[in-house]
Amino acid sequence: MNQKHLLRFIKKSYQVDADRVVYSTK
């Protein structure tokens, strides 16, 4: 896995976690 793809994967998973946190907080 190259670094660019890994970074994109981390960014995506981070965004999903952020959405989950926002959803849980409501």
From Swiss-Prot:
Listed GO biological process terms: IMP salvage
Pathway field: Purine metabolism; IMP biosynthesis via salvage pathway; IMP from AMP: step 1/1
Catalytic activity as recorded in UniProt: AMP + H2O + H(+) = IMP + NH4(+)
EC number in record: 3.5.4.6
Top-level taxon of the source organism: Eukaryota
Details of cofactor binding: Binds 1 zinc ion per subunit.
Essential cofactor(s): Zn(2+)
Annotated keywords: Hydrolase, Metal-binding, Nucleotide metabolism, Zinc
Gene Ontology molecular function, alphabetical: AMP deaminase activity; metal ion binding
InterPro entries, alphabetized: AMPD
Assigned protein family: Belongs to the metallo-dependent hydrolases superfamily. Adenosine and AMP deaminases family.
Function: AMP deaminase plays a critical role in energy metabolism.
Assembly description: Homotetramer.
Name the UniProt record assigns to this protein: AMP deaminase 1
Designated gene of the protein: AMPD1
